[in-house]
UniProtKB/Swiss-Prot annotation:
Effect in UniProt of substituting M669I: Loss of tubulin monoglycylation activity
Residues covered by the TTL domain: 345-702
Protein name, entry field: Tubulin monoglycylase TTLL3
UniProt organism field: Mus musculus
EC assignment: 6.3.2.-
Taxon lineage: Eukaryota, Metazoa, Chordata, Craniata, Vertebrata
Gene: Ttll3
Family matches, as PANTHER family: TUBULIN MONOGLYCYLASE TTLL3 (PTHR45870:SF1)
Chain residues that bind Mg(2+) 1: D649, E662
Domain writeup: Two conserved structural elements specific among monoglycylases, IS1 and IS2, are involved in glycyl chains initiation. Two conserved structural interfaces likely constitute the binding platforms for tubulin tail and microtubule.
Pfam families xref list: TTL (PF03133)
């Protein structure tokens, strides 16, 4: 570790507020020194750490010293109940040694101070701490001595209390601070054990782009707490937990609760457990289906829907982003690249004019000897005429017309002012000017036009200032973190080669291209970004907590747009920690490449921008976080007992405007530097305050977390299991009488109409079944379109005729003979001299022979011209049941066995919701 002095968090359980450990540089031995933190490291609330002050949160019993009484260290004189391990052999990180520390900042401390770094369990215990020979060693630190049964009894009591209070937790990953703070609250850990031969499912990073906004497997794609990619830590806090459990009590209690249900689960990735199998009172630190904003592809897609959720423009805080694997996005990106190049030409003209006016004649004469001959020849080799500026002006003018919706009548597939071939030539000349140093010729008249159009574009293009004039874009994998696979490019053909050369790599939108911020805010000529934490405790209503403390990460190289190497433009600590600082780097920059937000605020005051943090930066970051969550609220699986801590990365423009780059799930909590050692431990402690302490006490201290957004609750109707069921049967096609045969078993009485005849498919006769359906349909259509005058029926009670689009109302039935078929068993027999009907109605457009006492009620609104349905007749039941969903038939009477009319039995009212219509079901009659 470098620097004059560096702060080191010793242990979350051994330090109080405002304490840190320092090491004086240049010392050959380990010389860590404890002193108070500087004022800029403190916050405005009372205690930096949530150490329990009440007896309920403290450890219920005091753990006994495992060794003999003669080797027991004395209690510290500070007045608290913490044990003094000063008699233990000191070591620095992995080596155990003892040394005297000089005073702070060069002063001499007469009293020797030993480091409190405990030995690991792999190291042998000192002779003074070895158990007696007559004792049985159960495991490291726990011996079956005189007080063995008492420790077991106390551990059992503590476990029973934790089980009763539902204070069982389970952790997957390296979270020593969480373990320590939960143990202080009386929680007992249940070890997460995986069966031999099984492993956690690897995160699936290559999925369909359509699923990236909803998938369960991609929400944690930007997690940085992966065991395989763990950052180097300034201090391994797991050693302190092992030393704190030197007597084995916590290991014993973990074994006691191995069959208990954990009520707090803290994991690195969400896919470790399936939330669907958790009970309602089990808390977990992840939400399912959060990939809609924790992946670059999901954030790119969902922020486009922001106008539907809020009156805001995503282009004002999120750089333009496209998916290279999607054809629509690819086409939009190409057009955006063209227009950006045209705007950059206008900027170059204005910049060259300002430069020519600012340079004096004397300065030009002084620079003339420095201009070597090759440079003059290079300028003469390539010269771009003023026509190139006219093309750029015309393209920008057409773009303004398109934004104003003046191109409504234009073909959407037509090119933007220039054809694709012309745009290709335009880009080649643009590359010559920007990248190869060609000379751009322009006219004085063109300068004023460029300024006017740029002023108009300023009002409609929010990213005009930050995009610069070199047209640099950054290509990123859709679901990766820590800067893996990121490339900065400035040529369109090179970016499109990623799609053409490797289609499998770009399939389904796995890669995105985003506009690079060419004019970022710099500190001492170096680029930086900011990591901001926020906590989501509910999605309905959406509840967001914003952390007041943050940290910034510097690059190791000076900023330059001519060098597109990742060491210059990517500030991820996972990349920069492997690089050496440039010799041209400003000496005021920190050696560990990190500042706290308090130090950044002090720098803003030094550069005469004291209000930039409170008036521009913080409000902009809060708004960006809220908008990103609003657009993803419908995609995330809401679970009341879940919560999640996210880390957002921001880059600032020259006007201090924050630009959201990405949002990471499971942000790293590794104490890689002195800044992260303090802040990462603090954000974990304050997270437990919000999700655990606040559930019991709504007015408790939430640390540095601030509630910035909470929606009104939206009630979701509960599913009660109601099934919508529609019952019924199809209406049989009527059977014309002219084609019936004697002895044919039929389920309907044979009818005769004025239009032709045809046998029903249900008549049972193979001969008549072969009748053409096409002819029957043609007859029906002919009957519908051209009804005969004699077949027109008047509307009951009115003098008007029924409209022709009701074909059944224009059909008039004729009796073939004074005979009718009567059912006897399964054979139809003829009955003579009985008149059974005069009119009939059918929904199929053909007449049916019906009884004179039948009525048909329409359950749907009729045609406007037909205000009342006429009286209609229905045949009696002839050995079948007819159930109709379109027409309701109410039968009031029937024919007796001898042909006389009889009264029908009263029909009971049906229960609502069980019939075929909204009022009552179809009735069944008996003949």
């Amino acid at each position: 570790m470098q620097g004059v002095s560096s702060a080191l968090l010793l242990s979350a359980g051994q330090l109080g507020p405002g304490a840190a450990w320092y090491r004086q540089e240049g010392s050959s031995e380990c010389s860590w020194l404890r002193r108070s933190q500087p004022s800029e490291l403190r916050t405005n609330f009372s205690s930096r750490w949530p150490w329990p002050r009440n007896s309920e949160s403290r450890r219920s019993e005091r753990l006994q010293w495992p060794g003999p009484a003669s080797a027991k260290p004395e209690v510290a004189s500070c007045g608290d109940s913490r044990r003094d391990y000063s008699s233990l052999p000191a070591r620095h990180l992995s080596s155990a040694r003892e040394s005297s520390m000089p005073g702070a900042l060069g002063t001499v401390n007469p009293q020797p101070v030993r480091t409190l770094v405990p030995p690991t369990l792999d190291e042998p215990l000192p002779d003074a701490l070895r158990p007696p020979d007559d004792s049985l060693l159960l495991w490291r630190g726990l011996t079956k001595g005189p007080n063995h049964m008492g420790r077991l009894r106390n551990a059992k009591i503590h476990v029973e209390r934790a089980v009763k209070q539902k204070k069982i937790f389970m952790i997957h990953g390296r979270y020593p601070v969480i373990r320590c703070l939960l143990r202080q609250r009386g929680w007992v850990e249940k070890k997460m054990v995986h069966p031999p031969g099984t492993a956690l499912p690897a995160p699936q990073k290559d999925l369909d782009s359509s699923m990236l906004g909803d998938s369960d497997a991609t929400e944690d794609e930007d997690e940085e707490e992966n065991e395989m990619f763990r950052e180097s830590q300034l201090l391994d806090l797991d050693g302190f937990l092992e030393f704190d459990d030197l007597d084995g009590i916590h290991a014993l209690m973990s074994r006691m609760v191995r069959n208990e249900t954990p009520y707090l689960i803290w994991t690195t990735r969400r896919d470790v457990l399936d939330c669907r199998f958790l009970s309602k009172d089990q808390m977990i630190n992840h939400y399912a289906r959060a990939g809609s904003f924790t992946t670059k592809v999901g954030l790119c897609l969902n922020l486009r829907n922001l106008p539907w959720f809020d009156e805001a423009d995503a282009d004002s805080f999120f750089p333009r982003c496209y998916r290279l694997g999607a054809e629509d996005d690819k086409k939009a990106f190409i057009e955006d690249f063209w227009l950006t190049a045209a705007r950059n030409v206008l900027k170059l003209v204005v910049k060259l004019e300002e430069k020519s006016q600012s340079i004096s004649i004397q300065a030009r004469e002084e620079e003339a000897p420095e201009d070597t001959q090759p440079k003059k020849q290079e300028k003469k080799l390539v010269t771009v005429s003023s026509d190139f500026v006219d093309e750029a002006l015309s393209a920008c003018q057409e773009h303004l017309s398109s934004i104003a919706h003046k191109d409504i009548d234009k073909d959407p597939n037509s090119p933007l002012y220039l054809s694709p071939d012309d745009w290709s030539q335009f880009l080649q000349r643009y590359y010559q000017i920007v990248h190869e140093g060609a000379e751009l010729r322009y006219l004085e008249v063109q300068v004023q036009r460029c300024e006017d159009i740029l002023q108009q574009l300023q009002n409609v293009v929010p990213q005009l200032d930050m995009e610069g004039d070199r047209n640099i874009w950054i290509v990123k994998p859709g679901a990766k973190s820590r800067g893996r696979g990121i490339m900065c490019m400035n040529r369109l053909d090179e970016m499109l080669k990623l799609v053409d050369c490797n289609p499998m790599l770009m399939k389904d939108g796995k890669w995105i291209v985003q506009k690079y911020i060419e004019r970022p805010l710099l500190i001492f000529g170096t680029k930086f970004d900011l990591r901001q934490w926020f906590l989501v405790t509910d999605w309905n209503p959406l509840t967001v907590w914003f952390y007041r403390d943050s940290y910034i990460r510097f690059s190791t190289q000076p900023f330059s747009l001519k060098n597109l190497d990742n060491s210059v433009h990517l500030c991820n600590n996972s990349i920069q920690r492997h690089l050496e600082a440039s010799c041209h780097r400003h000496p005021m920059l920190p050696p560990d490449n990190m500042w706290s937000s308090q130090r950044f605020q002090a720098h803003l005051q030094e550069v005469d921008a004291p209000k930039a943090w409170s008036s521009v930066i913080v409000p902009g970051m809060k708004a960006a976080v809220i908008h990103a969550l609003q657009t993803s609220q419908d995609n995330v699986q809401c679970r009341k007992a879940s919560f999640e801590l996210y880390g957002a990365d921001f880059v600032f423009g020259e006007d201090f405007q924050p630009w959201l780059i990405e949002i990471n799930a499971s942000p790293t909590m590794a104490p890689s530097t002195a800044v992260t050692a303090r802040l990462c431990a603090g954000v974990q402690a304050d997270t437990l305050r919000v999700v655990i302490d606040r559930r019991l006490d709504r007015s408790c201290d939430t640390g540095a977390f601030e509630l910035i957004y909470k929606q009104p609750a939206v009630e979701v109707p509960q599913y009660v299991g109601i099934r919508l069921l529609v019952e019924g049967s199809t209406i049989k096609k009527p059977v014309p009488v002219g084609h019936r045969r004697t002895g044919v078993r039929s389920s309907l009485p044979h009818l005769l109409t004025q239009q032709g005849s045809g046998e029903s498919k249900d008549s049972g006769s193979p001969t008549h079944r072969s009748a053409s359906r096409k002819n029957a349909r043609a007859e029906s259509l002919e009957h519908t379109e051209k009804p005969e005058p004699a077949a027109v029926a008047s509307v009951s009670g009115k003098g008007k005729k029924a409209p022709f689009h009701f074909p059944s109302l224009h059909s008039k039935a004729w009796l073939p003979s004074p005979r009718v078929h009567r059912p006897q068993g399964r054979v139809l027999r003829l009955q003579h001299d009985q008149l059974v009907g005069s009119k009939a109605l059918s929904t199929t457009g053909k007449a049916l022979m019906t009884l004179p006492t039948a009525k048909v009620l329409m359950s749907f609104p009729p045609h406007p011209d037909l205000k009342l349905a006429p009286s209609m007749l229905k045949p009696g039941k002839v050995g079948f049941e007819l159930c109709c969903t379109t027409w309701r038939v109410v039968l009031s009477g029937g024919i007796g066995e001898e042909g006389h009319r009889q009264r029908a039995a009263p029909r009971p009212s049906s229960a609502p919701g069980k019939g075929l219509s909204s009022t009552e079901p179809c009735s069944k009659t008996e003949t």
